[in-house]
């Protein structure tokens, strides 16, 4: 099953193994470096898809010092070189993830109390997502992924632990999802109907009082209906970790999403072993499998799976 091709909208993949976005901190002032390019170049060739690590869409949304940038100062020549060096290795496609960290920045020195975003702030951020997505397309990436998971800004809207708003952007799951859907809709309109659009969605906080997995089917359906070609399901409010889950961390979420969507669903997190991966695919628990941390340590892991 891993070796069977699959498509997500216009994104044609040679197999179902994906390198998910994992930050390398290899950038200098947000610029593409040779170390960054080499990191992805070494992992390209056999794997179906690489999702390049999150890039910030505006300076206020920068998560860490070594993060890639896709704001107005983006290194377009470097990004184009990255895409070219991945593509020349063979069948691997590469998608770029775009993100806003919200209040999780490790570079902002002024830790003043966090205030609710105004409607004007939200409008500015949506436009920043749009402009970043257009830069991704211009650079030649095979698609763009909107990051709405792991405690960053968009998932802060979805989580009742971080979203204390009332009105149209708070309280109910539908309202808390609204800003995410608006970003997806605006990006879809900007990049066009045929350009592959992925969404990494944090479907459950796994914390008391947080977002609940029971809402995953409905939320996933709304994300698809808004223009998503591939749902990259995940969870956990602050980073990727879920206490007590050492394997198949988010498979239960992919299974819930599969109840209502007919676009491909990608899941990562503690999924190990070729036989087990094929079992999950055959069972319909997911359509693609992310395999990240082992590939960070040892590129040859790909040869054991494909």
For every predicted segment, state its role:
Residues 1-306:
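Flavin-dependent oxidoreductase catalytic cores
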